[in-house]
Regions:
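An N-terminal structural lobe/cap that precedes and organizes the functional/catalytic core
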Residues: 2-112
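RAMP-family (Cas7-like) RNA-binding scaffold and associated basic/acidic loop-rich RNA-contact surfaces
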Residues: 4, 11, 93-287
Length: 287
């Protein structure tokens, strides 16, 4: 697809009629320029999502910079901003929490499971449990063969995917595969290191510090909480005092994608980064 390609309604209708997909591949680079670090999202234990991909017949070490789920959420929030700014019109369902000023509402563009989320399941519409309401029934009765109800009330669920796993039938609820998938991958990724240190201007060390009965601290042994062997002690470092020598953040055990002793949380440098987005047209045709 050339960089000057403009997707019009006529082109989209023609593509949906017979093509397999609309694909976007966009080269990206770090804000600091080539060679500067980027910091992927961390997962259990502080590891990044490392994987090996086949590129031009070669194994290439890659790292996930933004997942399919995360990209979908970003797209949904962009739609929500445009909707609230009046730049587009779109059906939107919201669960409102008037008594909680810091929350106010959660919409189908924000809830993790979209219209199928437990937030809406456990809400009411005009005093009726949501799933027993006109809108709820239209959503529940939607199927791959007839998704008109879902299209009317929550069309974005047909684009970003939905699984009605929170209803009365649990995991047997209707599934709609996502039609739009996007992710950002870093190719030729090399792990960096994360360092930490602290110089205590007070120079606190080798001081007897005790824990008080209310879990505070004191230097008075007589006011300390008594243990089996006398006053219960603690260390200055436990109170965020004393020096922390320069250290590297390394894995203390083998993790899913990182071996013991390998760097954690240190960012990565890349040969290149790329956004790949695919709109499945067969997926749209099924609807």
């Amino acid at each position: 697809m050339s960089t000057d390609f403009i997707l019009t309604l006529d082109r989209l209708q023609a593509a949906v009629a017979g093509a397999a997909a609309i694909r976007l591949r966009q080269a990206l680079e770090p804000a600091g320029g080539p060679g500067s670090k980027v910091f992927p999202p961390t997962h259990e234990g502080g590891q990044y999502a490392w994987e090996t991909r086949r590129v031009d017949g070669q194994d290439v070490r890659c790292v996930l910079l933004d997942s399919v789920q995360s990209q979908a959420n970003r797209c949904e929030l962009a739609l929500l901003d445009a909707l609230r700014d009046g730049r587009l019109r779109l059906p939107l369902i919201e669960a409102r929490f008037a008594e909680f000023s810091d929350l106010r509402s959660v919409s189908t563009l924000e809830a993790p499971h979209r219209i199928a989320d437990a937030i809406f399941r456990d809400s009411t519409l005009d005093g009726v449990p949501f799933r027993d309401s006109v809108i709820g029934k239209a959503f529940i009765e939607s199927t791959i063969r007839d998704a008109n109800g879902l299209f009317r009330w929550c069309p974005t669920a047909l684009v970003f995917g939905m699984w009605d796993s929170t209803g009365s039938v649990g995991g047997l609820g209707t599934k709609f595969a996502r039609a739009l998938s996007a992710e950002i991958i870093g190719y030729g990724a090399q792990a960096g290191v994360h360092t930490s240190s602290r110089i205590d201007p007070l120079g606190i060390k080798n001081i007897e510090i005790y824990v008080t009965p209310d879990e505070d601290w004191t230097t008075d042994a007589g006011a300390a909480k008594q243990g089996k062997s006398g006053p219960e002690k603690t260390k200055p470092s436990a109170l965020n005092h004393s020096n922390i020598p320069p250290t590297l953040d390394l894995a203390e055990e083998n993790l899913a994608t990182v071996k013991k002793g390998e760097p954690l949380r240190g960012g990565v440098t890349l040969d290149r980064a790329e956004l790949c987005a695919v709109l499945s047209l067969p997926g749209l045709r099924k609807l």
